[in-house]
Amino acid sequence: MAQHGRRYVRAFISGFFVAVPVTVTFLDRVACIARVEGVSMQPSLNPDARGESDIVLLNRWRARNYDVQRGDIVSLVSPKNPEQKIIKRVIALEGDIVKTLGHKNRYVKVPRGHVWVEGDHHGHSFDSNAFGPVSLGLLHSHATHILWPPNRWQKLKPFLPVERESVQND
């Protein structure tokens, strides 16, 4: 009987030592989940500021390959605070010319290897209008689905507000 118990313990330990590296690699390279805090992406994410925070599925694989399109919602390392990750919408890609918000008649050409990101809730978002174009190297992942709360479960499709379309696309 004791030998039978040891076999289960040994199987559990060996399974544990296989499962942990596989899980860590998956979360580091493929996908993970994150809770969205704040109001900067309202109404797309966290539409009710007093309610539950949205929990989103983040696809890390696409970000690693710099597979970015206008309208994608992405998670990125904050250019102002490397300890913080922020979530924003891609408005423009390299070579695009964008009219900035909050600056009269100011136009910016997005440099090579960069994107222009903004929150959906203008005036309540710390985004490219404050810190400029963002290096593709700061992208962490793409938000692909809202997982929680259950009544908000949905796929996040790329969407670009008409008023935020680029002035010129290369």
Swiss-Prot record:
The chain crosses the membrane at residues 12-31. GO terms for cellular component: mitochondrial inner membrane peptidase complex. Its main location: mitochondrion. One of its GO terms (molecular function) is endopeptidase activity. It is a single-pass membrane protein. Its EC number is 3.4.21.-. The active site is at residues 40, 88. Keywords: Hydrolase, Membrane, Mitochondrion, Mitochondrion inner membrane, Protease, Transmembrane, Transmembrane helix. Coiled coil: none annotated. The keyword Protease applies. It is found in: Mitochondrion inner membrane. One of its GO terms (biological process) is signal peptide processing. CDD domains: S26_SPase_I. Heterodimer of 2 subunits, IMMPL1 and IMMPL2. Belongs to the peptidase S26 family. IMP2 subfamily. Catalyzes the removal of transit peptides required for the targeting of proteins from the mitochondrial matrix, across the inner membrane, into the inter-membrane space. NCBIfam families: sigpep_I_bact. This is Mitochondrial inner membrane protease subunit 2. It comes from Xenopus laevis (African clawed frog). The gene is immp2l.
